[in-house]
């Protein structure tokens, strides 16, 4: 079913016989079409075994999104402190300076308003002006980045970025999250007793559910902020190129002992944001194959150690070369000659 045929069916057949859903007409017509497209994508991913069966999203409870597009020149006009959204008008932004403004030459194509943990967020899709893409002047030597679980990232120049999940800040929030989840579970058990007619305490589930959502959102924001600051510091040195490894994250997630640690590192988000930032700064991003022996190869003589174990944190070669395992891998990635440009 195309978007046009869906609109004809919705307006001429469904809504006249279902007046309780008349609120659908309050939003943009393209927003309803986009919702059907998202549903089609969800079922496609389900049949490809990429995700679970799609769940119904109730508009007043679930973390749902409202999609909008630019229909005329006056729509989607963004200023530093507010944005003009179709059917809503001017909406004030709490955090200023995050969205690209129209006066600076950015052209907004579409956007979405989402609700997460009791807060509303807006994201936009824009056309990047040519003046924003920087030239390749005054660049320094290239760097290699080795991502891992012990340390988040080890650079070929010796810079080490710690694992944010091992800090006391994250551990304290995760401890609060575990307690909040246990409390929510007990409330659901009390609700079952109340339905059976047994004596139980009144369960205020929605408030506790919101507390759990806020803790999840807080932890996620701390990790995302750390990734953004790490990438900004890497790109600030203006290297001629940045080389990373194409990690097999899907295979790493199959290890039940490491899956939680791999998921919390957010390697895919790091790669996508690094790719975007390198494009803005005019830096070449090189991606080396996952089969490249970056950790097993000696950076001094090129010999490959086949007996290297994961517990061996210091790389020792027969030629006398001794180096930290992750630093050796980062140096090999920097000097790799077989790669793809992202």
Segments from the language model and where they lie:
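N-terminal cap/recognition module
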Residues: 1-5
């Amino acid at each position: 079913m195309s978007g046009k045929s869906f609109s004809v069916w919705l307006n001429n057949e469904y809504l006249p016989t279902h007046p309780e859903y008349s609120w659908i007409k309050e939003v943009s017509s393209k927003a309803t079409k986009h919702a059907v497209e998202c549903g089609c994508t969800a079922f496609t991913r389900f049949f490809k075994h990429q995700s679970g069966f799609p769940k119904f999203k109730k508009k007043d409870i679930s973390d749902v999104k409202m999609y909008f597009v630019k229909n005329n020149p006056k729509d989607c006009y963004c200023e530093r402190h507010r944005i003009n959204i179709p059917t809503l008008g001017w909406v004030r932004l709490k955090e200023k300076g995050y969205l690209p403004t129209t006066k600076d030459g950015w052209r907004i194509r579409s956007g979405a308003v989402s609700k997460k943990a009791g807060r509303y967020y807006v994201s936009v899709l824009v056309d990047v002006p040519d003046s924003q893409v920087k030239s390749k002047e005054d660049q320094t030597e290239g760097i290699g980045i080795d991502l891992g679980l012990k340390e988040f990232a080890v650079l070929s120049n010796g810079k080490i970025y710690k694992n944010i999940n091992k800090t006391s800040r994250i551990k304290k929030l995760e401890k609060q999250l575990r307690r909040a989840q246990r409390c929510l579970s007990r409330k659901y058990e009390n609700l079952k007793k109340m339905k059976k007619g047994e004596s139980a305490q009144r369960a205020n589930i929605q408030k506790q559910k919101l507390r759990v959502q806020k803790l999840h959102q807080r932890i996620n924001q701390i990790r995302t902020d750390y990734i953004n600051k790490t990438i900004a510091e890497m790109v600030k040195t203006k290297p001629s190129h940045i080389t990373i490894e194409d990690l097999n994250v899907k295979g790493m997630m199959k290890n039940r002992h490491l899956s939680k640690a791999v998921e919390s590192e957010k390697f895919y988000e790091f790669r996508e944001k690094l790719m975007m930032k390198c494009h803005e700064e005019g830096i070449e991003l090189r991606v080396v194959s996952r089969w490249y022996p970056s950790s097993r190869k000696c950076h001094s003589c090129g010999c490959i150690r086949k007996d290297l174990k994961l517990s061996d944190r210091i790389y020792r070669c027969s030629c006398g070369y001794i180096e930290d395992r992750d630093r050796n891998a980062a140096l090999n990635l920097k000097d790799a000659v077989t790669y793809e440009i992202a």
